[in-house]
From Swiss-Prot:
Residues making up the signal peptide according to the UniProt record: none
Keyword rRNA-binding assigned: yes
Organism: Chlamydia trachomatis serovar D (strain ATCC VR-885 / DSM 19411 / UW-3/Cx)
Chain intervals for the UniProt region annotation (Disordered): 94-122
Protein's name in the database: Small ribosomal subunit protein uS13
Subunit text: Part of the 30S ribosomal subunit. Forms a loose heterodimer with protein S19. Forms two bridges to the 50S subunit in the 70S ribosome.
UniProt-recorded Gene Ontology molecular function terms: rRNA binding; structural constituent of ribosome; tRNA binding
Statement: the UniProt record of this protein carries the keyword Cytoplasm: no
Keywords assigned: Ribonucleoprotein, Ribosomal protein, RNA-binding, rRNA-binding, tRNA-binding
Length: 122
């Protein structure tokens, strides 16, 4: 398994798929990175030479925000929204949907398990 910026990527999968195992790299960005380094997207990740792995590491560290840095940036952005009392920040704080979805029904993923309320006594 080749290790790129601290992440083991699957060796048996094609390079364009293997790179998507890194947080922050999707299919489009994977293609772009492969094109910039002039690598074969159909080659298996195990077929990469040490020199190619080194170039890949250098490029990802210098030009892209991925893995831990990206996770930290997202968390700090959410914290900032909460501290400036933005509407989106308040939705994050209350664990409610942020992007305008309905909440009367659905939104269970965001709200969590149902909290049962006892029925009204006669």
């Amino acid at each position: 398994m080749p290790r790129i910026i601290g992440i083991d990527i699957p060796a048996k999968k094609k390079l364009k798929i293997s790179l998507t195992y890194i947080y922050g790299i999707g299919p489009a960005l994977s293609k772009e990175i492969i094109a910039r380094l002039q690598l074969n997207p159909e080659a298996r990740a195990a077929e990469l030479t040490e020199e190619e792995v080194g170039r890949l590491n250098a490029l990802l560290q210098s030009d892209y925000v991925v893995e831990g840095d990206l996770r930290r940036r997202v968390q700090s952005d959410i914290k900032r929204l909460i501290t400036i009392h933005a509407y989106r920040g308040q939705r994050h704080r209350l664990s409610l949907p942020v992007r305008g979805q309905r909440t009367k029904t659905n939104s269970r993923t965001r709200k969590g398990k149902r909290k049962t309320v006892a029925g009204k006594k006669k």
